[in-house]
Amino acid sequence: NTSDYLAESLMRSLVTASRAAVANPTNYEARSNIMWTATWALNTLMGCGKTQDWEVHMIGQAVGAVTDATHGMTLSAVALPYYRLIMPYGLEKFARFATNVWGINAAGKDDEELAAAGLDAMENWMREIGCVLSIRELGADESSLDAIADATLTMTGGYRTLTRVEVLDVLRKSLAAK
């Protein structure tokens, strides 16, 4: 639908602009496109007519509360383990993400393979531009996990309402990420 196409276009724009900004930090156009993309992504237009999933933000906020890291850094640290956990519950959307954002050829792949390839492409891009991929990089360790899980507000209405055990699983996978 239109909301999905808009979101996918914004993500493609972010990928292009972030690569350009990392290659040349003084590239005003690239940086302005990152900000413009972020503005559109967060102005609620993308969620019109959709069930929204904000759980990754809730986990990120809890990580920030314990580590004092910025929200963007906490999101990048927990996004991949979270998306891999919920992928089976939004398989069609993750498969679309792979083809429409990353250009992955769907030939010979089922939705699960396609979705996993899309998340692998996202991980490669995040590494390429220098995103934080582990909460350890933010100052968390095994002793922080219970406090972060306790501070995570779980929300209904997304792909899945996470249990505390699942939140801890996301955190442990992020902690172990290299």
List PLM regions with ranges:
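Active-site segments that bind and position negatively charged phosphate/pyrophosphate groups
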Residues: 1-120
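C-terminal charged capping/lid subdomain of soluble metabolic enzymes
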Residues: 101, 105-178
